[in-house]
Amino acid sequence: MTILKANSLEKSFGRRKVVDGVTLEIDAGEIVGLLGPNGAGKTTTFRMICGMLTPDQGQVLLRDQDVTDWPMYIRARDGGMGYLPQQSSVFAKLTAEQNLIAMMELLNMPSDQQLTRCNELLEQFKISHVRKTRAGRLSGGERRRLELARCLVSRPEIIMLDEPFAGIDPVTVQSIQTIIRQLAREGISILITDHAAREILQITHRTYVVSDGRILCSGTADDIVRHPGVKEKYLGDIDLESTKWPKPVFTRLAPTGRNFTPTGVRADDL
């Protein structure tokens, strides 16, 4: 079941067309990558899908509802979309716990539900031991996990991850990959973009590669690394022999009460 679809997106800056007819879709519980060389239009495409930019042409649909003109905060509030920015977004002077509570208050979550939800997220992201630590004193990995936890406060149906592997060590990268897989098992759809192509291809069900403002290739990691155009313009001879690719299966979630509630989700069976 398709959760998000971008139809024929176009965007120009001055006389330069940066995105020229990009179409992509994401199913429920699916991890989808968005890759491409610098200047290819990948970031602009991602920002249009998030609601940070408005396309000149084309549509963005969330569960078949046109949200093209919705700003990011409305997509988060009413459309079930979460967003993890590339730059650190935590409140450095607040504790990890206070960061989560602040987001809950911003979303008008009932006060009697806040502590329970906070405890769930701290445990899920393995940061309970730093709940009383100021965010500015957390390690890079702890801070990234806190940012992911904040992204899930509202129980989104799809999350957009912008450079989640930037500035963290290999062990933490593996930890974040594990979390992303778990989120997919829980039925959350994920669109992820990063310069770390290998790490992206290790966890995605499908990936789109953008070049010169258009989709150059889409498919599994194996499809991507074998595509001659992708090799020439982007990946070169990247070695992914040891990579395991998640295999989607279908499961079912309880209703969330939102207009965009799924009747079925896809999750991986790792």
Q: What spans do the regions from the language model cover?
A:
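The feature captures the beta-strand-to-loop junction immediately N-terminal to the Walker
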Residues: 35-37
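Helix-to-loop junction immediately C-terminal to a conserved catalytic motif
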Residues: 50
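Conserved catalytic motifs of ABC-family nucleotide-binding domains
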Residues: 155
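ABC ATPase NBD coupling module
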Residues: 66-82, 87, 111-115, 225-228
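Conserved ABC ATPase "signature" region
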Residues: 101, 112-130, 178-181
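Conserved ABC ATPase signature
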Residues: 134-138
